[in-house]
Amino acid sequence: MSKIRLDQYLCQNGLVQSRERAKALIMSGIVFVNEQKVDKAGEMIAPDAKVEVRGHDIGYVSRGGLKLEKAMQVFPMRPDGKVCMDIGASTGGFTDCMLQNGAVKVYAVDVGYGQLAWSLRTDERVINMERTSIRNVNPEDLSEPVAFFSVDVSFISLKHIFPVADAITTPDAVGVCLVKPQFEAGREKVGKKGVVRDPATHREVLQMAEGYAMANHFTPAGLDFSPIKGPEGNIEYLMYVQHCEEPQPLPEGLIEKVVAASHETLDKAPNLH
């Protein structure tokens, strides 16, 4: 018998409703084939393999939704009734989470093409801005300013994101930004496979991100670590920001506290990629 893709198997056997959901489940690390965890959607398996989904469906088209879910649990931010933007949308986990929590419109921005889940691509509340660099987005490109936004981008520093966010958001907008040490630290501080493990570098990167926010009229009002590691096991951070005229820094000692907690919690956690 010829082998089939794992995500295809999940769909054909009624374990999920869509390939996007299948991919999300597989990447979340809860799909097992013949008692072995498999985290690649394209893994080829035998049709008679024993496939199990252990634990719970993550509830979003991708794991990104879990990051925003945590942000809404720990920070006073809600997308209910707001025009939102998902910067670095990819498959659309953040977009999905925003819609499930009452967003009236979401601009899904990504330089890539064809990545946004079909369920979101066909949702009239979603404005699909694929093949679009956030650095090139102007207020004129939007029918109204954004009141709630998220940032989850790769290979670009937040230094280039905050000036755009300043220009396209409402005076009282709020947002959550993924701070990724591997894309903020100097090249000499990034280890093998693009991994940054040194807590000192994490603290330095968070101080830089704090400065980028404040330089563009955003108060970094909260900080926590992402519940999910990035590719290759990088610890990433959630920074909650509020648009304002007179930005204030994070509370004294918070960066040190969060970095310490992130390493204590995630250093031994498995990678889900």
Language model features: what each stretch is:
Residues 159-176:
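A short glycine-rich, Lys/Arg-flanked "PGG" loop and its adjoining helix->strand segment in the class I
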Residues 97-105:
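Conserved S-adenosyl-L-methionine
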Residues 181-198:
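Short, glycine-/aromatic-enriched active-site segment of Class I SAM-dependent methyltransferases
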Residues 1-49, 83-84:
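A basic, amphipathic helix-loop patch mediating RNA/tRNA/ribosome contacts
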Residues 235-273:
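Flexible, glycine-/basic-rich loop-and-beta segments that form/coincide
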Residues 80-90:
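Conserved class I S-adenosyl-L-methionine
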Residues 92-93, 114:
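Glycine-rich SAM-binding Motif I of class I
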Residues 107-160:
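S-adenosyl-L-methionine
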